């Protein structure tokens, strides 16, 4: 039962990361999801660089809006890697998960961090998702 519970939690994390990445990629074509509600703000973001971009940016498209999209894509990748790793443990290496306090604590700690960040900065969908995923991971670890 514990591997199934871990797989459910991992699947939720994978879904959150993949969904975030897809919506971000769609925003590169037509901004709708992670764009400011005031279009003027996005246009202003397109007109400036970040303070860290001293001199010439790597790309001619280097601006705050593109940096924002890149951050969102790299953020998605991290979440997908976490969910994917947990799914591999659930489906193929559950014994390693069950026997390793380090793996269990890492899974709980990283997912907890995403939950806290979500509560502080995001909206209800990722908060609910990370909350349920965390509960699944904790239950799987307790049952292991």
PLM ranges: what are they?
Residues 23-36, 88, 92-99, 120, ...:
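Juxtamembrane transmembrane-helix termini
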Residues 93-98, 111-129, 142-144:
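Membrane-helix boundary connector in multi-pass membrane proteins
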Residues 85, 107-117, 133-137:
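Hydrophobic, membrane-inserted alpha-helices
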Residues 1-38:
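N-terminal signal-anchor transmembrane alpha helix
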Residues 3, 7-17, 76-79, 83, ...:
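Residues within membrane-spanning alpha-helices of integral membrane proteins
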Residues 1-10, 88-99, 139-144:
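Helix-coil boundary and interhelical linker segments in multi-pass alpha-helical membrane proteins
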Residues 3-10, 62-65, 69-72, 97-104, ...:
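Membrane-water interface of alpha-helical transmembrane segments
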Residues 37-88:
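Core segments of alpha-helical transmembrane spans in multipass integral membrane proteins
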